[in-house]
Each structure stands twice: as structure tokens, then as C-alpha cells.
Amino acid sequence: FYMGIFRCNQVLKYVPAIDMDDTEKKQVLAQASFMRALWYFQINLLWDKGTLILEPVDAGYRPKDATEAEIWAQVEKDLLYAAENLPDSWDAENLGRATRGAAKALLGKAYMQQHLYDKAKEQLNWLIEKEKTGLYGLIDNWVDNFTDLNENNKESVFEIQFDDKNKGDTGNNASMATGFQRTQFYAPSGIGWGDGKARRWLVDEYLKEKRIDGGNDIRLYNSILYHGFSLDFPNESKKYYNIADADADEQWNNWGKDPEDCYIRKYNTSYYRDREDYFARNNYRIIRYADILLNYAECIVETNGTVAEAAKYVDQVRDRVGLAKLKDSRWAACLNSKDAFLKRLQMERTLELCFEGWRWGDLKRWGMLDTQEGINELKSRDVDFNNFVIGKHRRLPIPQYEIDQSDGQLTQNPMY
């Protein structure tokens, strides 16, 4: 995180002195401001505080604590500047650069984490209105958000560009930096490292509701590898990698002996090859328009809007994958109150956005990590929360080495 911030600070410090076109200069500075805000946003989500470094520093610099509020204030300042100076879109040669919409989306999310829903709604509404112009919207095929077949589309608000060109050896080959490596770490043992697993409760949650056509939620098939998926999706391929010997229903056979084993399928490259490596070519979507729609629905009810109005935006996300509108679904009772709607919205976000990096921020924003009631709900689904300590584990510890090197300027997070 702080290496990225250091590089942003170099741009923000030295570019103003360069003789160049003024509009282009502002756009360069705005991109650096956006990226610095993105890094600090993540720091606040993970540690609840950090150290605020806004200029290039040398090895002798000793950082000091910055509070969560101080970091949010800097995130807001950087993103307001970015939103003012970034274009709505870029030409083909510059696809992937931060845009005004990306800045407003991240700013809206930052406000939401602080429960400033009025401000968040204002920022997110800009993107909602741009759907009318075609700048943003949901693409027809949900899975295209996780392959290289339809990148930088109208659903993508901000995505990191990756490619598999100039492939080199594994290890520390510099070419690895251009490829998306997550697929290698999450793929099942025997294909990848199997480092990231899903929990069975998420599979069961998907299976609670059928599509209008009677089939299961296609997001499940494309998000999680689990024992029995070929039975739940008989019309989809039983193979999830292009392996010649496909005698077994769920190839490959050695990817897990435990029937509870569930691996992350989202973003894998089984649609074009039989293995994973460090050079996947699919871009990583940081913010999608579907995420914005669900965030906007939350803002509506948190600012005294009606549940019926908010449900329209959730229904857009559900309709895309063939599910009934909320009022016609088994969850229709969620429309009876704000609390019931927000509880259902929590699960709608989980089913749409699992493994995309927003879950922890959601749990913190909803207060589920701060009460025994919230932890009990999480424990009922996920044994990882059995040892969760309220007041401690909502944040990570500050690395002790950094504290030791700070000459007393940095302090440890509570209870560590």
C-alpha cells in the first residue's frame, strides 16, 4: 500500500513543475490523487488507521499515527480533486485509466463507510444518471465481467489491466507483473495452489432460489467449484478445465476429497485452457456498476427513501441473471420494512459480489463485527468467526517491525 502511495506522492510533488499542457497535467495529477485515495481507502478498511504521508520521503523518515477520520478526510480531498479533473471516459489507447465515474464511485463508497449516506447518494447518483447515456450499465452476460472476452465494458467502473503477453519463467521474472496471478493461487489443488476457498453455506444460499426458467443461479456455477455442481447445472459443462480425459463427471478428480471443499471459480481461466499460471490475461474489476446499483439502493433507504424505490435497483441486478423481482420472489416480505430490506440486501450483495473484495467493508459498515448478535450470525455460517474477538479482530495489527522503527510515533491497534 505505502509503496503505491510513495509513487503517487512523487507524481503529485514533481509533475506540477513540468512544462506541459495544463489539461493533461491536471489529468495526470488527478490519476495520482485517485490512486492514492484507493490505497488509503484500503488501509482504513483493514487497519482503521494508518500513517498519512503526502510527500516523497526518504529512509530516515519516521511516520506517525493518523486516525481513521484523518485518513477519510484525505481520501475525500483526493477524490474530489480527481472527480473534478478526470474525464468521463478515455480513448481506446488509454482504456483502464481512472475516470470521473471511478472517482465518484470510490468517494461514494468512502462516504458510506462513514455512514454519510446523503453524500454517498449524491456521488453515486451521477453514475446512475449516466446509465441513460450508455456510459454505464449492466452487460447481458454476467460471466463476461470475469474473463478477457469483454473487458472495459459499460459495467466496468474501474478495472486493473492485465495480459499474458511476453510470458516468462515463474519465480521473480518481471513479466509476471503484467499477468493476473490470483487465478493460480485460488485454483483447486492439482491445477493451482488452492490457497483460497469458499464455504459451503454460500453454495447453499445460491441454491435457495431458482431462476424464472427453473434453473439454478448461473452465478453459482461461475463463482464456486464444489462437489455436485454438475448435478445442479446439467446443461453446463461438467469439465471446468479443457482436459482431454473427461470420463469423470467433475474433472479433475484430485481437486478435493472432502465433500465440503469449495474452491473459488470466479476469474479462473478454464474457459480457454487446462491449467493456471502467473500469467492470466483477464482484467481485475475493482468496481462494477452492479456494485453501484446495490450501494445506491442502500443509500436510498438509509436516507429515508422508500423500500419500493430502492428495490428497483436490486431488481436490475437480479433480472440480469434471470431471477424474479423481489416482490415476486420468496423474499417478498423484505419489502415490508427498511430493516427487512437491508437484511436481504446484505445477501444480495454477497451473491453478486462474492470474492471481489468488498465483503469486509460491508460487514464493518453494517456493524456486524461490533456486536455479539452480528458475530453469532456470521458464526452460524462460517466457523472462521468462532474465535472472533469483538473490539480486536475488526482490524489488523500494525506490523510490529514498523512500530519498532518509528521511534515511538506509531502505536499498536487495541488488544494486540
Locate each region found by the language model.
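C-terminal substrate/ligand-recognition segments
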Residues: 218-319
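An aromatic- and glycine-enriched ligand-binding surface/loop that stacks and positions planar moieties
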Residues: 80-81, 97-248, 375
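Conserved, well-structured interaction surfaces
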Residues: 1-47, 63-69, 79-91, 269-284, ...
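Structural motif corresponding to the intra-repeat A-B loop/turn of tetratricopeptide repeats
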Residues: 43, 114, 301-303
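Long, intrinsically disordered, low-complexity segments
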Residues: 1-4, 74, 142-202, 279-284, ...
